Amino acid sequence: MTQSQTVTVDQQEILNRANEVEAPMADPPTDVPITPCELTAAKNAAQQLVLSADNMREYLAAGAKERQRLATSLRNAAKAYGEVDEEAATALDNDGEGTVQAESAGAVGGDSSAELTDTPRVATAGEPNFMDLKEAARKLETGDQGASLAHFADGWNTFNLTLQGDVKRFRGFDNWEGDAATACEASLDQQRQWILHMAKLSAAMAKQAQYVAQLHVWARREHPTYEDIVGLERLYAENPSARDQILPVYAEYQQRSEKVLTEYNNKAALEPVNPPKPPPAIKIDPPPPPQEQGLIPGFLMPPSDGSGVTPGTGMPAAPMVPPTGSPGGGLPADTAAQLTSAGREAAALSGDVAVKAASLGGGGGGGVPSAPLGSAIGGAESVRPAGAGDIAGLGQGRAGGGAALGGGGMGMPMGAAHQGQGGAKSKGSQQEDEALYTEDRAWTEAVIGNRRRQDSKESK
């Protein structure tokens, strides 16, 4: 059983925070980096950045869904506290009876990251260590020379700073305390930590792009240019006498080219950026809808034809007080009080046929009619359960008969005449004398009144 606790709640603060948490954050960059040159290592590096950026965007989208779930939980908590306020008001209206429970948080919600996977790794194979000198220079000089990589890096660096500046929404609450508040604040802090980590990964990916761009600049500076190589070859062809001096220069170019290509192949191999899955948001379900109340005890169940009359008898469902009374002038002046008392005691009547009407009326004397003390309401034809009002009415009918009998024995309950004459009871009439229903539920006392327990046994 949940233990009651004192909580501090500002419902509007929770609702405002839900709107804050759910508000869209900055969109990640969508720039696609292109290779700075035609070297295989450069192409692989650019492709790795594309895959990492795509996965970052997918993880960020999953994080947005979790923030929406968190906002929904906050709204559900605020709504629940609103209903708790109503329950508290009801409890106060009920003379302070009843308790109000603090809203508690449930388990985590659904997993929006179920489809997320690690970032694929691109193959790191590059050009062979030996490549034609002029072909290597041509490939190195073809492309945007790292311009798109620099733009890509700038975009993700800016995004990193934007994310870091947008975590205030995950702060704690000023006017909400309790178990649910603690759980929600923990979930908010998890989201904050995850956003900060995604910001760091954004900066790391930007550094990778910057590094490849700088690596390419270094390679261009260290590698012989295509123009230099073509000029050297032309000089070699046109000046046979200078070939002995030209060959060592060409060999040096080749050596420099191989060194640059080796460095490019090794250093351009990037690690994939693998973001963590967003933490699942805390789940607080909406308050259940109010339960529909059944028949209120004391209200009669109307017949199916809507007439308010018991089928087959033409009589109202509640037995009527007999119009005849004692020779002294009918019912006493305090009839209403006696009927109310009788209604309370009627609920305690046993099904024992030995109960006499005098036990209700309080007076002795007079013959007890052999017929049942209830009204003729159709007998076995009535198949519906008796409501509390029926029971109270039954008590009223018996009270009237008892009062008349106590005064002089002249009164007779309605319906008694048609049951037959004589002092002997048949087996069937004895069964009809048995109580059809005994009300013994404490929660109906507000309708039929308080009574002493086990009155039926004491009155025998």
Swiss-Prot record:
Annotated gene: espB
Lineage: Bacteria, Bacillati, Actinomycetota, Actinomycetes, Mycobacteriales
Pfam family, one: EspB_PPE
Keywords: Acetylation, Secreted, Virulence
Keyword Secreted: yes
Site (Cleavage): 358-359, 386-387
Top-level taxon in the UniProt lineage: Bacteria
Note: BTP15, an inhibitor of ESX-1 secretion, decreases secretion of this protein without being bacteriocidal. BTP15 inhibits autophosphorylation of MprB with subsequent up-regulation of espA and decreased secretion of EspB and EsxA.
Single GO MF descriptor: identical protein binding
PTM info: Cleaved in the C-terminal region by MycP1. The exact location of the cleavage sites has been the subject of conflicting reports. Further in vitro studies confirmed that Ala-358 is the primary cleavage site and Ala-386 is a secondary cleavage site. Likely translocated as a full-length protein into the periplasm, where it is proteolyzed by MycP1. Proteolysis may serve to limit the secretion of other ESX-1 substrates.
Domain comment (free text): The N-terminal region contains a fused PE/PPE homology domain. The C-terminal region is disordered.
Subcellular location: Secreted
Predominant location: secreted
Entry protein name: ESX-1 secretion-associated protein EspB
Transmembrane segments: none
Similarity comment: Belongs to the EspB family.
SUBUNIT field: Mature EspB oligomerizes and forms donut-shaped rings. In contrast, the full-length protein does not oligomerize. Interacts with the C-terminal region of EspK.
